[in-house]
Amino acid sequence: TDTSLADQYFRKYFYRKGFKDFNHYVIPLRKMFKLWELDDKVYTSILTNKLIFERYFSRSDLRLAKILAYNENSVFFLKDRVIQINTLSEFIDLLRILVNERSLTKGIFIKKTEDSHGGRNTFKITDADLVSDSHDLNKLFDEVRRSGFLFQELVIQHKLLSNIYPGSLNTIRFDTYTDRNNITYLYS
C-alpha cells in the first residue's frame, strides 16, 4: 500500500462528498520524487525563506502578513532604522514597541526566517507575555539572536476558521507541478 495516500486523504479533503476520482488529485510517491527532481533549486529560496517570499510576492499585490521587523543575529531591521540589540531588556523594549503599534491585535508573530513551517520556530507575543515571567522571553531572545527571524503583524483569523482549532492559523496550500513543456498542473 501507498502510505502517502492516507496522508493525502486528509490533506486534500478526499473525505468530502463530490470527489469522483481521487486519482486526479493524488500525487503518488514515485511522481512526488519526480517532482522533486524537476524542482528548480534556483527558486527554492523564494519559497523557503519567509523574508524573500514576502519581498518577492508583495510586488504582486498579494495579501501577506506585514513584516514589522526582521533580524540577523543581534542586528534588527525596522522600517526606518537598523539597531543592535544585545540585552534582554532591549529586546523586550523592541517587542513592546512592535506590539503596541498593533492597536487592533495587540500582538505579533515571531517566525524563524527559514525552517518555521507547521508552527515550528513560530511564537506569538501579546501584551500579556511582556509582563509575565521573563524566563520564556529570555529563551526566545537567546533563540532569536542566534539566527534570523521575522516579526510580523498578528493575523486575526475569521471566527469560523478559528472554530476549527483556535490554537492554529489555518492556511490554504496549493500543490502545483510544471512539466518540461512548461504546462502547470494544480493538484490540490
Where do the protein language model's features map onto the residues?
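Conserved N-proximal alpha/beta basic substrate-recognition cap immediately N-terminal to
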Residues: 1-97, 116
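Short, amphipathic alpha-helical segments
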Residues: 47, 51, 85, 89, ...
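Short, solvent-exposed loop/turn segments at secondary-structure junctions
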Residues: 73-74, 114-117, 156-157, 179-181
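Short His-Asn-centered micro-motif
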Residues: 47-48, 111-113, 152-154
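Short, solvent-exposed polar/charged micro-motifs at secondary-structure junctions
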Residues: 75-81, 118-123, 160-165
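Phosphate-binding site of ATP-dependent enzymes
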Residues: 105-108, 133-188
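Residues at the C-termini of beta-strands that transition into short coil/loop
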Residues: 68-71, 126, 155, 178
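Glycine-rich phosphate-binding loop of ATP-grasp-fold ATP-dependent ligases
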Residues: 74, 105-137
